[in-house]
Amino acid sequence: MKYVLVTGGVVSGLGKGVTASSIGVVLKACGLRVTTIKIDPYLNTDAGTMSPFEHGEVFVLDDGGEVDLDLGNYERFLDIKLTRDNNITTGKIYQSVINKERRGDYLGKTIQVVPHITDEIQDWIERVAMNPVDGKEGPPDVCVIELGGTIGDIESMPFIEALGQFSYRVGPGNFCLVHVSLVPVLNVVGEQKTKPTQHSVRGLRGLGLAPDILACRSTEPLEENVKAKLSQFCHVPDQRAHEAILKVLDLQFVGKVPREPKLVEWTERASKFDKLKATVKIVMVGKYTGLSDSYLSVLKALLHASVAMGRKLVVEWVPSCDLEDSAAKETPEAHKKAWKLLKGAEGILVPGGFGDRGVQGKILAAKYARENNVPYLGICLGMQIAVIDFARSIMKLPGANSTEFDPDTMSPCVIFMPEVNPEMVPEFEKAGLSFVGKDESGRRMEIIELPSHKFFIGVQFHPEFKSRPGKPSPLFLGLIAAASGQLETLLQPSSNIVNPNPMPRFPIPKKTIYHAKKPLDSLVNGYFANGNVIHT
Protein backbone atom coordinates (compact mmCIF):
# COMPACT_ATOMS: atom_id res chain seq x y z
CA MET A 1 0.00 0.00 0.00
CA LYS A 2 1.23 3.48 -0.93
CA TYR A 3 0.21 6.60 0.99
CA VAL A 4 -0.05 10.26 -0.04
CA LEU A 5 -0.51 12.72 2.84
CA VAL A 6 -1.90 16.22 2.13
CA THR A 7 -1.30 18.89 4.78
CA GLY A 8 -1.93 22.65 4.84
CA GLY A 9 0.02 25.64 6.07
CA VAL A 10 -0.08 29.44 6.55
CA VAL A 11 -3.91 29.77 6.62
CA SER A 12 -6.94 27.49 6.53
CA GLY A 13 -9.33 27.23 3.60
CA LEU A 14 -6.64 26.86 0.92
CA GLY A 15 -8.33 23.90 -0.75
CA LYS A 16 -6.63 20.84 0.73
CA GLY A 17 -9.74 18.80 -0.07
CA VAL A 18 -9.72 19.77 -3.74
CA THR A 19 -5.95 19.18 -3.87
CA ALA A 20 -6.33 15.71 -2.35
CA SER A 21 -9.20 14.91 -4.72
CA SER A 22 -7.21 16.15 -7.71
CA ILE A 23 -4.22 14.03 -6.74
CA GLY A 24 -6.56 11.05 -6.53
CA VAL A 25 -7.95 11.80 -10.00
CA VAL A 26 -4.45 12.03 -11.51
CA LEU A 27 -3.33 8.77 -9.86
CA LYS A 28 -6.54 7.05 -10.96
CA ALA A 29 -5.94 8.34 -14.49
CA CYS A 30 -2.50 6.70 -14.29
CA GLY A 31 -4.19 3.32 -13.82
CA LEU A 32 -4.06 3.07 -10.03
CA ARG A 33 -6.89 2.18 -7.67
CA VAL A 34 -7.31 4.98 -5.14
CA THR A 35 -8.98 5.33 -1.75
CA THR A 36 -9.08 8.33 0.58
CA ILE A 37 -9.15 9.20 4.29
CA LYS A 38 -10.01 12.57 5.85
CA ILE A 39 -8.63 13.41 9.30
CA ASP A 40 -10.54 16.08 11.25
CA PRO A 41 -8.80 17.04 14.51
CA TYR A 42 -11.97 18.27 16.25
CA LEU A 43 -13.33 16.40 19.28
CA ASN A 44 -16.74 15.63 17.75
CA THR A 45 -17.08 11.97 16.81
CA ASP A 46 -18.64 13.04 13.50
CA ALA A 47 -20.04 16.10 11.73
CA GLY A 48 -23.69 15.14 12.24
CA THR A 49 -24.46 17.59 15.04
CA MET A 50 -22.44 20.51 13.71
CA SER A 51 -24.09 23.66 12.38
CA PRO A 52 -23.53 24.27 8.66
CA PHE A 53 -22.21 27.71 9.64
CA GLU A 54 -19.53 25.96 11.71
CA HIS A 55 -18.23 23.46 9.21
CA GLY A 56 -20.27 23.66 6.01
CA GLU A 57 -22.40 20.84 4.69
CA VAL A 58 -22.75 17.49 6.45
CA PHE A 59 -22.18 14.87 3.75
CA VAL A 60 -24.07 11.58 4.12
CA LEU A 61 -22.47 8.31 3.01
CA ASP A 62 -24.03 5.04 1.86
CA ASP A 63 -23.66 3.50 5.33
CA GLY A 64 -25.43 6.50 6.90
CA GLY A 65 -22.21 8.07 8.15
CA GLU A 66 -22.47 11.83 8.63
CA VAL A 67 -19.09 13.20 7.65
CA ASP A 68 -17.04 16.19 6.55
CA LEU A 69 -17.94 17.71 3.18
CA ASP A 70 -14.49 16.84 1.79
CA LEU A 71 -15.56 13.20 1.61
CA GLY A 72 -18.22 14.39 -0.80
CA ASN A 73 -15.45 15.89 -2.93
CA TYR A 74 -13.61 12.57 -2.89
CA GLU A 75 -16.68 10.63 -3.96
CA ARG A 76 -17.52 13.09 -6.74
CA PHE A 77 -13.99 13.36 -8.11
CA LEU A 78 -13.10 9.67 -7.89
CA ASP A 79 -16.56 8.10 -8.31
CA ILE A 80 -16.08 5.88 -5.25
CA LYS A 81 -18.14 4.86 -2.21
CA LEU A 82 -16.61 5.60 1.16
CA THR A 83 -17.68 4.59 4.68
CA ARG A 84 -17.84 6.43 7.98
CA ASP A 85 -14.46 4.92 8.90
CA ASN A 86 -12.87 6.95 6.08
CA ASN A 87 -13.43 10.03 8.25
CA ILE A 88 -11.18 10.03 11.34
CA THR A 89 -11.80 12.52 14.14
CA THR A 90 -10.11 13.11 17.46
CA GLY A 91 -13.38 12.08 19.12
CA LYS A 92 -13.42 8.72 17.33
CA ILE A 93 -9.78 7.99 18.21
CA TYR A 94 -10.13 8.84 21.89
CA GLN A 95 -13.43 6.99 22.12
CA SER A 96 -11.85 3.88 20.64
CA VAL A 97 -8.86 4.03 22.99
CA ILE A 98 -11.04 4.63 26.06
CA ASN A 99 -13.30 1.71 25.10
CA LYS A 100 -10.24 -0.55 24.83
CA GLU A 101 -8.98 0.67 28.19
CA ARG A 102 -12.36 -0.08 29.82
CA ARG A 103 -12.30 -3.59 28.37
CA GLY A 104 -8.83 -4.15 29.78
CA ASP A 105 -7.15 -4.46 26.39
CA TYR A 106 -4.09 -2.53 27.64
CA LEU A 107 -3.57 -4.87 30.59
CA GLY A 108 -3.45 -2.16 33.24
CA LYS A 109 -0.92 0.11 31.53
CA THR A 110 -1.02 3.89 31.87
CA ILE A 111 -2.79 5.19 28.75
CA GLN A 112 -0.95 8.07 27.09
CA VAL A 113 -1.09 10.12 23.88
CA VAL A 114 2.19 8.44 22.87
CA PRO A 115 2.07 5.56 22.16
CA HIS A 116 -1.60 4.65 22.60
CA ILE A 117 -3.35 7.49 20.77
CA THR A 118 -0.69 7.67 18.04
CA ASP A 119 -0.76 3.89 17.57
CA GLU A 120 -4.56 3.93 17.30
CA ILE A 121 -4.34 6.57 14.56
CA GLN A 122 -1.80 4.53 12.60
CA ASP A 123 -3.72 1.29 13.00
CA TRP A 124 -6.96 2.98 11.90
CA ILE A 125 -5.30 4.34 8.75
CA GLU A 126 -3.75 0.99 7.82
CA ARG A 127 -7.00 -0.87 8.41
CA VAL A 128 -9.27 1.48 6.45
CA ALA A 129 -6.80 1.97 3.59
CA MET A 130 -7.10 -1.72 2.72
CA ASN A 131 -10.87 -1.56 2.12
CA PRO A 132 -11.88 -1.42 -1.58
CA VAL A 133 -14.09 1.56 -2.43
CA ASP A 134 -14.44 1.21 -6.20
CA GLY A 135 -16.62 -1.89 -6.35
CA LYS A 136 -13.70 -4.18 -7.21
CA GLU A 137 -12.12 -6.98 -5.21
CA GLY A 138 -8.86 -6.54 -3.36
CA PRO A 139 -7.17 -3.56 -1.68
CA PRO A 140 -6.52 -0.25 -3.47
CA ASP A 141 -3.04 0.73 -4.65
CA VAL A 142 -2.84 4.19 -3.09
CA CYS A 143 -4.51 5.89 -0.12
CA VAL A 144 -4.69 9.70 -0.19
CA ILE A 145 -4.91 11.11 3.36
CA GLU A 146 -5.96 14.69 4.05
CA LEU A 147 -5.08 16.19 7.43
CA GLY A 148 -7.58 18.92 8.29
CA GLY A 149 -6.59 22.20 9.89
CA THR A 150 -3.27 24.01 9.62
CA ILE A 151 0.21 22.92 10.61
CA GLY A 152 0.90 24.28 14.08
CA ASP A 153 -2.63 23.81 15.45
CA ILE A 154 -2.51 22.33 18.96
CA GLU A 155 -5.38 19.93 18.22
CA SER A 156 -3.47 18.46 15.25
CA MET A 157 -0.33 17.54 17.22
CA PRO A 158 -1.21 13.90 18.01
CA PHE A 159 -1.96 13.32 14.32
CA ILE A 160 1.28 15.01 13.20
CA GLU A 161 3.25 12.82 15.59
CA ALA A 162 1.36 9.71 14.47
CA LEU A 163 1.89 10.48 10.78
CA GLY A 164 5.57 11.11 11.36
CA GLN A 165 5.83 7.67 12.96
CA PHE A 166 3.67 6.24 10.19
CA SER A 167 6.05 7.41 7.47
CA TYR A 168 8.77 5.32 9.16
CA ARG A 169 6.41 2.40 9.74
CA VAL A 170 5.54 2.03 6.04
CA GLY A 171 9.11 2.75 4.95
CA PRO A 172 10.77 4.65 2.08
CA GLY A 173 8.99 4.51 -1.26
CA ASN A 174 5.57 4.11 0.35
CA PHE A 175 4.88 7.60 1.72
CA CYS A 176 4.62 10.94 -0.10
CA LEU A 177 3.84 14.26 1.61
CA VAL A 178 2.16 17.07 -0.33
CA HIS A 179 2.02 20.39 1.52
CA VAL A 180 -0.57 22.99 0.44
CA SER A 181 0.55 26.55 1.14
CA LEU A 182 -0.21 30.17 0.31
CA VAL A 183 1.93 32.48 -1.80
CA PRO A 184 0.42 35.92 -1.09
CA VAL A 185 0.75 38.99 -3.27
CA LEU A 186 1.19 42.32 -1.49
CA ASN A 187 -0.74 45.06 -3.25
CA VAL A 188 1.92 47.61 -2.37
CA VAL A 189 4.65 45.98 -4.47
CA GLY A 190 2.65 43.41 -6.46
CA GLU A 191 5.25 40.74 -5.72
CA GLN A 192 4.59 37.07 -4.92
CA LYS A 193 6.01 36.37 -1.47
CA THR A 194 7.54 32.99 -0.62
CA LYS A 195 8.44 33.60 3.04
CA PRO A 196 5.10 32.33 4.49
CA THR A 197 5.55 29.03 2.64
CA GLN A 198 9.20 28.76 3.68
CA HIS A 199 8.25 29.26 7.34
CA SER A 200 5.38 26.75 7.03
CA VAL A 201 7.72 24.12 5.60
CA ARG A 202 10.27 24.83 8.32
CA GLY A 203 7.57 24.33 10.95
CA LEU A 204 6.49 21.09 9.32
CA ARG A 205 10.06 19.81 9.31
CA GLY A 206 10.39 20.76 12.97
CA LEU A 207 7.48 18.42 13.68
CA GLY A 208 9.17 15.50 11.95
CA LEU A 209 7.60 15.65 8.47
CA ALA A 210 9.36 16.82 5.30
CA PRO A 211 7.26 17.66 2.22
CA ASP A 212 8.06 15.97 -1.07
CA ILE A 213 5.82 18.29 -3.09
CA LEU A 214 4.41 21.80 -2.57
CA ALA A 215 0.96 22.77 -3.87
CA CYS A 216 0.97 26.57 -3.81
CA ARG A 217 -2.13 28.74 -4.01
CA SER A 218 -1.95 32.31 -5.25
CA THR A 219 -4.11 34.92 -6.96
CA GLU A 220 -2.08 34.50 -10.17
CA PRO A 221 -0.02 31.61 -11.64
CA LEU A 222 3.36 31.39 -9.92
CA GLU A 223 6.18 33.17 -11.69
CA GLU A 224 9.11 31.02 -12.81
CA ASN A 225 11.56 32.68 -10.42
CA VAL A 226 9.14 32.07 -7.54
CA LYS A 227 8.87 28.37 -8.41
CA ALA A 228 12.65 28.11 -8.58
CA LYS A 229 13.03 29.88 -5.24
CA LEU A 230 10.49 27.61 -3.51
CA SER A 231 12.10 24.54 -5.06
CA GLN A 232 15.53 25.61 -3.83
CA PHE A 233 14.63 26.71 -0.30
CA CYS A 234 12.04 24.00 0.41
CA HIS A 235 13.91 21.17 -1.34
CA VAL A 236 11.09 20.04 -3.62
CA PRO A 237 10.97 19.37 -7.40
CA ASP A 238 9.44 21.88 -9.84
CA GLN A 239 6.14 21.01 -11.62
CA ARG A 240 5.07 17.65 -13.16
CA ALA A 241 3.20 16.62 -10.00
CA HIS A 242 2.18 13.13 -11.12
CA GLU A 243 5.75 12.25 -12.09
CA ALA A 244 7.03 13.49 -8.74
CA ILE A 245 4.43 11.48 -6.80
CA LEU A 246 5.05 8.31 -8.82
CA LYS A 247 8.79 8.72 -8.28
CA VAL A 248 8.52 9.21 -4.51
CA LEU A 249 6.23 6.16 -4.29
CA ASP A 250 8.46 4.03 -6.55
CA LEU A 251 5.64 3.61 -9.05
CA GLN A 252 7.01 5.25 -12.19
CA PHE A 253 8.20 1.98 -13.70
CA VAL A 254 5.28 -0.26 -12.71
CA GLY A 255 3.95 -1.95 -15.84
CA LYS A 256 0.28 -1.04 -15.39
CA VAL A 257 0.94 2.65 -14.80
CA PRO A 258 1.13 4.75 -17.99
CA ARG A 259 3.67 7.57 -18.10
CA GLU A 260 0.96 10.15 -18.75
CA PRO A 261 -2.41 10.21 -16.97
CA LYS A 262 -5.43 9.77 -19.22
CA LEU A 263 -7.41 12.92 -18.45
CA VAL A 264 -9.23 13.39 -21.76
CA GLU A 265 -12.68 13.18 -20.11
CA TRP A 266 -11.77 15.84 -17.57
CA THR A 267 -10.12 18.20 -20.05
CA GLU A 268 -13.07 17.92 -22.45
CA ARG A 269 -15.51 18.66 -19.63
CA ALA A 270 -13.46 21.66 -18.51
CA SER A 271 -13.28 22.93 -22.09
CA LYS A 272 -17.04 22.57 -22.48
CA PHE A 273 -17.60 24.45 -19.23
CA ASP A 274 -15.35 27.32 -20.33
CA LYS A 275 -17.32 27.73 -23.57
CA LEU A 276 -20.78 27.91 -21.99
CA LYS A 277 -22.61 31.13 -22.83
CA ALA A 278 -26.38 30.64 -22.38
CA THR A 279 -27.36 30.82 -18.71
CA VAL A 280 -29.93 29.17 -16.49
CA LYS A 281 -30.99 30.96 -13.29
CA ILE A 282 -31.86 28.85 -10.26
CA VAL A 283 -33.04 30.48 -7.04
CA MET A 284 -32.00 28.61 -3.89
CA VAL A 285 -34.28 29.28 -0.94
CA GLY A 286 -32.78 28.23 2.39
CA LYS A 287 -31.79 29.30 5.90
CA TYR A 288 -27.98 28.91 5.59
CA THR A 289 -27.55 31.03 2.46
CA GLY A 290 -24.82 33.10 4.13
CA LEU A 291 -22.36 30.22 3.61
CA SER A 292 -22.46 28.48 0.23
CA ASP A 293 -20.59 25.44 1.62
CA SER A 294 -23.75 24.67 3.62
CA TYR A 295 -25.30 23.43 0.36
CA LEU A 296 -22.13 22.28 -1.41
CA SER A 297 -23.47 18.99 -2.79
CA VAL A 298 -26.64 20.70 -4.04
CA LEU A 299 -24.52 23.31 -5.82
CA LYS A 300 -22.31 20.65 -7.37
CA ALA A 301 -25.34 18.63 -8.51
CA LEU A 302 -26.78 21.76 -10.15
CA LEU A 303 -23.43 22.41 -11.83
CA HIS A 304 -23.14 18.84 -13.14
CA ALA A 305 -26.65 19.03 -14.60
CA SER A 306 -26.11 22.50 -16.07
CA VAL A 307 -22.95 21.48 -17.91
CA ALA A 308 -24.70 18.37 -19.24
CA MET A 309 -27.52 20.57 -20.56
CA GLY A 310 -25.11 23.12 -22.06
CA ARG A 311 -26.01 25.96 -19.72
CA LYS A 312 -23.95 28.27 -17.52
CA LEU A 313 -25.30 28.04 -13.99
CA VAL A 314 -26.38 31.20 -12.18
CA VAL A 315 -27.47 30.64 -8.56
CA GLU A 316 -29.33 33.36 -6.71
CA TRP A 317 -29.44 32.96 -2.92
CA VAL A 318 -32.63 33.89 -1.10
CA PRO A 319 -32.78 33.66 2.73
CA SER A 320 -36.17 32.07 3.40
CA CYS A 321 -36.81 34.43 6.34
CA ASP A 322 -36.71 37.40 3.97
CA LEU A 323 -39.75 36.08 2.05
CA GLU A 324 -41.99 36.02 5.09
CA ASP A 325 -44.65 38.66 5.78
CA SER A 326 -42.92 39.69 9.01
CA ALA A 327 -39.83 40.68 7.00
CA ALA A 328 -41.88 43.25 5.07
CA LYS A 329 -42.16 45.24 8.32
CA GLU A 330 -38.83 44.40 9.98
CA THR A 331 -36.47 44.40 6.97
CA PRO A 332 -38.43 45.85 4.03
CA GLU A 333 -35.44 46.20 1.68
CA ALA A 334 -34.38 42.59 2.21
CA HIS A 335 -38.01 41.48 1.74
CA LYS A 336 -38.31 43.39 -1.53
CA LYS A 337 -34.98 42.05 -2.82
CA ALA A 338 -35.88 38.44 -1.92
CA TRP A 339 -39.19 38.56 -3.79
CA LYS A 340 -37.58 40.24 -6.78
CA LEU A 341 -35.04 37.43 -7.02
CA LEU A 342 -37.71 34.75 -6.58
CA LYS A 343 -39.88 36.25 -9.32
CA GLY A 344 -36.90 36.31 -11.67
CA ALA A 345 -36.21 32.59 -11.22
CA GLU A 346 -36.18 30.13 -14.11
CA GLY A 347 -36.16 27.34 -11.54
CA ILE A 348 -36.61 27.18 -7.75
CA LEU A 349 -34.91 24.75 -5.37
CA VAL A 350 -35.67 24.35 -1.67
CA PRO A 351 -33.01 22.12 -0.04
CA GLY A 352 -33.14 20.17 3.20
CA GLY A 353 -33.01 21.70 6.67
CA PHE A 354 -34.49 21.48 10.15
CA GLY A 355 -36.00 23.79 12.72
CA ASP A 356 -38.91 26.18 12.23
CA ARG A 357 -36.92 29.33 11.42
CA GLY A 358 -37.65 30.41 7.85
CA VAL A 359 -40.12 27.59 7.17
CA GLN A 360 -42.95 29.96 6.27
CA GLY A 361 -40.69 31.58 3.68
CA LYS A 362 -39.99 28.20 2.12
CA ILE A 363 -43.71 27.46 1.99
CA LEU A 364 -44.24 30.75 0.17
CA ALA A 365 -41.48 29.85 -2.32
CA ALA A 366 -43.16 26.50 -3.08
CA LYS A 367 -46.51 28.26 -3.41
CA TYR A 368 -45.08 30.79 -5.87
CA ALA A 369 -43.50 28.01 -7.99
CA ARG A 370 -46.74 26.02 -8.02
CA GLU A 371 -48.99 28.94 -8.90
CA ASN A 372 -46.70 30.38 -11.58
CA ASN A 373 -45.62 27.13 -13.26
CA VAL A 374 -41.96 27.70 -12.34
CA PRO A 375 -39.90 24.45 -12.28
CA TYR A 376 -39.50 23.36 -8.67
CA LEU A 377 -37.41 20.76 -6.86
CA GLY A 378 -37.87 20.24 -3.12
CA ILE A 379 -35.45 18.05 -1.20
CA CYS A 380 -36.36 16.52 2.18
CA LEU A 381 -37.84 19.53 4.01
CA GLY A 382 -38.35 21.07 0.56
CA MET A 383 -40.77 18.23 -0.22
CA GLN A 384 -42.55 18.52 3.12
CA ILE A 385 -43.21 22.24 2.81
CA ALA A 386 -44.59 21.69 -0.70
CA VAL A 387 -47.07 19.23 0.81
CA ILE A 388 -47.98 21.77 3.52
CA ASP A 389 -48.58 24.48 0.92
CA PHE A 390 -50.77 22.15 -1.14
CA ALA A 391 -52.84 21.26 1.92
CA ARG A 392 -53.33 24.89 2.88
CA SER A 393 -53.91 26.38 -0.58
CA ILE A 394 -55.63 23.63 -2.59
CA MET A 395 -57.29 21.50 0.08
CA LYS A 396 -58.37 24.55 2.09
CA LEU A 397 -56.79 23.40 5.36
CA PRO A 398 -55.35 26.69 6.68
CA GLY A 399 -53.97 25.07 9.83
CA ALA A 400 -52.14 22.31 7.98
CA ASN A 401 -48.59 21.89 9.24
CA SER A 402 -45.85 19.51 10.26
CA THR A 403 -45.91 18.22 13.81
CA GLU A 404 -42.22 19.23 13.94
CA PHE A 405 -43.29 22.88 13.78
CA ASP A 406 -46.73 22.66 15.42
CA PRO A 407 -47.24 19.55 17.59
CA ASP A 408 -50.90 20.50 18.17
CA THR A 409 -51.92 21.16 14.56
CA MET A 410 -55.44 19.98 13.68
CA SER A 411 -54.26 18.97 10.17
CA PRO A 412 -50.96 17.09 10.65
CA CYS A 413 -50.05 16.52 6.99
CA VAL A 414 -46.41 15.84 7.92
CA ILE A 415 -45.60 13.68 10.95
CA PHE A 416 -42.32 12.47 12.45
CA MET A 417 -42.55 9.03 10.88
CA PRO A 418 -43.14 8.24 8.06
CA GLU A 419 -43.22 11.92 7.12
CA VAL A 420 -46.13 12.64 4.94
CA ASN A 421 -49.15 11.48 6.95
CA PRO A 422 -50.37 8.28 5.17
CA GLU A 423 -53.89 8.83 6.50
CA MET A 424 -54.15 12.00 4.41
CA VAL A 425 -52.63 10.61 1.19
CA PRO A 426 -56.00 9.70 -0.43
CA GLU A 427 -57.22 13.26 0.16
CA PHE A 428 -54.04 14.69 -1.39
CA GLU A 429 -54.30 12.46 -4.44
CA LYS A 430 -57.98 13.29 -4.89
CA ALA A 431 -56.99 16.98 -4.89
CA GLY A 432 -54.36 16.39 -7.60
CA LEU A 433 -51.03 15.75 -5.83
CA SER A 434 -49.42 12.48 -6.93
CA PHE A 435 -47.26 10.35 -4.63
CA VAL A 436 -45.24 8.55 -7.29
CA GLY A 437 -42.60 7.01 -5.02
CA LYS A 438 -43.32 4.98 -1.88
CA ASP A 439 -41.47 2.50 0.28
CA GLU A 440 -42.36 -1.20 0.07
CA SER A 441 -44.93 -0.88 2.85
CA GLY A 442 -46.71 1.87 0.92
CA ARG A 443 -46.77 4.10 4.01
CA ARG A 444 -43.63 6.18 3.55
CA MET A 445 -44.00 8.76 0.78
CA GLU A 446 -40.67 9.25 -1.02
CA ILE A 447 -41.55 11.27 -4.14
CA ILE A 448 -44.32 13.74 -4.89
CA GLU A 449 -45.22 15.17 -8.27
CA LEU A 450 -47.76 17.69 -9.52
CA PRO A 451 -48.89 16.24 -12.90
CA SER A 452 -50.50 19.50 -14.05
CA HIS A 453 -47.23 21.41 -13.59
CA LYS A 454 -44.28 21.82 -15.97
CA PHE A 455 -41.89 20.34 -13.38
CA PHE A 456 -42.89 20.15 -9.73
CA ILE A 457 -41.05 17.39 -7.85
CA GLY A 458 -40.37 16.77 -4.17
CA VAL A 459 -38.23 13.95 -2.76
CA GLN A 460 -37.69 12.80 0.80
CA PHE A 461 -34.18 11.49 0.10
CA HIS A 462 -31.05 13.41 -0.99
CA PRO A 463 -30.22 12.86 -4.68
CA GLU A 464 -27.46 15.49 -4.57
CA PHE A 465 -25.15 13.09 -2.74
CA LYS A 466 -25.01 10.76 -5.74
CA SER A 467 -24.42 13.30 -8.50
CA ARG A 468 -21.11 13.06 -10.36
CA PRO A 469 -19.46 15.38 -12.91
CA GLY A 470 -20.03 12.85 -15.71
CA LYS A 471 -23.23 11.36 -14.27
CA PRO A 472 -25.52 14.12 -13.02
CA SER A 473 -28.50 13.27 -10.83
CA PRO A 474 -31.57 12.88 -13.10
CA LEU A 475 -33.73 14.96 -10.76
CA PHE A 476 -31.33 17.89 -11.03
CA LEU A 477 -31.01 17.20 -14.73
CA GLY A 478 -34.80 17.48 -15.02
CA LEU A 479 -34.89 20.75 -13.06
CA ILE A 480 -32.21 22.36 -15.25
CA ALA A 481 -33.82 21.01 -18.43
CA ALA A 482 -37.23 22.39 -17.43
CA ALA A 483 -35.74 25.71 -16.36
CA SER A 484 -33.92 26.10 -19.69
CA GLY A 485 -36.77 24.91 -21.91
CA GLN A 486 -35.11 21.60 -22.80
CA LEU A 487 -37.22 19.09 -20.87
CA GLU A 488 -39.04 17.67 -23.89
CA THR A 489 -35.72 17.23 -25.69
CA LEU A 490 -34.21 15.48 -22.67
CA LEU A 491 -37.13 13.05 -22.46
CA GLN A 492 -36.82 11.97 -26.08
CA PRO A 493 -35.58 8.36 -26.40
CA SER A 494 -32.92 9.56 -28.85
CA SER A 495 -31.54 12.13 -26.39
CA ASN A 496 -27.75 11.94 -26.18
CA ILE A 497 -27.59 13.67 -22.80
CA VAL A 498 -25.32 11.86 -20.35
CA ASN A 499 -27.05 8.88 -18.73
CA PRO A 500 -28.65 9.60 -15.34
CA ASN A 501 -27.04 8.16 -12.27
CA PRO A 502 -29.12 5.14 -11.27
CA MET A 503 -28.16 4.80 -7.62
CA PRO A 504 -30.34 6.40 -4.90
CA ARG A 505 -28.62 7.46 -1.71
CA PHE A 506 -29.37 7.22 2.00
CA PRO A 507 -31.88 7.79 3.52
CA ILE A 508 -34.08 6.32 0.78
CA PRO A 509 -35.36 2.89 1.93
CA LYS A 510 -33.92 -0.31 0.51
CA LYS A 511 -36.96 -0.78 -1.71
CA THR A 512 -39.02 1.94 -3.32
CA ILE A 513 -42.13 1.28 -5.36
CA TYR A 514 -42.26 3.72 -8.24
CA HIS A 515 -45.61 4.34 -9.90
CA ALA A 516 -45.30 5.60 -13.50
CA LYS A 517 -47.84 8.32 -14.28
CA LYS A 518 -46.60 10.75 -16.97
CA PRO A 519 -43.83 11.38 -19.55
CA LEU A 520 -41.52 12.77 -16.87
CA ASP A 521 -41.43 9.25 -15.46
CA SER A 522 -38.83 8.21 -18.02
CA LEU A 523 -36.43 10.61 -16.30
CA VAL A 524 -37.23 9.58 -12.73
CA ASN A 525 -37.45 5.94 -13.80
CA GLY A 526 -33.79 6.03 -14.77
CA TYR A 527 -32.99 7.10 -11.23
CA PHE A 528 -34.42 3.88 -9.84
CA ALA A 529 -33.03 1.45 -12.41
CA ASN A 530 -31.25 -0.84 -9.97
CA GLY A 531 -31.80 -3.99 -7.98
CA ASN A 532 -33.09 -2.23 -4.87
CA VAL A 533 -36.16 -0.80 -6.58
CA ILE A 534 -39.46 -2.26 -7.70
CA HIS A 535 -41.04 -0.82 -10.86
CA THR A 536 -44.81 -0.97 -11.28
Which residue ranges define each predicted feature?
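Cysteine-nucleophile active-site neighborhood
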Residues: 21-25, 341-418, 476-484, 507, ...
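Short Asp/Glu-rich motifs
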Residues: 45-47, 223, 327, 388, ...
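C-terminal and late-domain segments of enzyme folds
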Residues: 419-536
